[in-house]
UniProtKB/Swiss-Prot annotation:
Function according to Swiss-Prot or TrEMBL: Zinc phosphodiesterase, which displays some tRNA 3'-processing endonuclease activity. Probably involved in tRNA maturation, by removing a 3'-trailer from precursor tRNA.
Annotated EC: 3.1.26.11
Gene designation per UniProt: rnz
Origin species: Bacillus cereus (strain B4264)
Protein name per UniProt: Ribonuclease Z
InterPro entries in the record: Metallo-B-lactamas (IPR001279), RibonucZ/Hydroxyglut_hydro (IPR036866), RNase_Z/BN (IPR013471)
Amino acid sequence: MEFVFLGTGAGVPSKGRNVSAIALQLLEERGQTWLFDCGEATQHQILHTSVRPRRIEKIFITHLHGDHIFGLPGLLGSRSFQGGTTPLKVYGPKGIKQFIEVALSVSTTHVKYPLEVVEITEEGTVFEDNEFYVETKRLSHGIECFGYRIVEKDIQGALLVDKLLEMGVKPGPIFKRLKDGEVVELEDGTILNGNEFIGPPQKGRIITILGDTRYCEASRELAQDADVLVHEATFAAEDEQQAYDYFHSTSKQAASIALQANAKRLILTHISSRYQGDTYKELLKEARELFSNTEIATDLKSFPVEK
């Protein structure tokens, strides 16, 4: 599991930062990539990374401001042009379906893979399978905006092979049956309960990716006990009133959310173009004063998520 930040700027592109897009690489977990937001020129940014459009399985849109969606039609079309055939599902607020349909229709763009658009109308679980589930809550922004909590389900513990070998049980199909939790009778009549030969489960990871937002309780709830919290930091602490007026957060407010939520790690993104060169490091310094395990994303930077 790895983050690849494709765009980390706020509002409009700048020389140093493109607009919002984050790839969550789940190559080891499911051989796929999930994309969060898709601002203008996202597919161009992808060319400089290991992200492959054909592997994008899901796209989660936080809200419908242009800096978060204007790259979507182009990416959807290019994925088809490059030979993508596997299904793709897009999640987002009401209006995302119309945006995609109109953009593809007017430009006569035809996708050759199954494309499904899910409009989120209620908070709660928007996706679940055997490996992950994704929950969402409304944030505090000028238009409807969602944050996403991605939860990896606990992974079954390993088969206690050494314990079985010590008992004289030879490797073979019986190992798989025990790993599946079956009750097995050996040739000598010994009964083995598979559940007694499975090690402790490996706890799954929790990832929280927030859209644009003021400091709010929903952010804390989504970030509770997260292994990684990705939070916007459009402004410095001295501009807190301006952040509030424009429905955004400061770096210190992001750190406060991480601290309150007992998150393990904080990554700041959505940085205003006013912070050029190394001036963005002041945002990092302010956040670390409150939450030490803070990093700040830059375009094309990767962040592994350890188990």
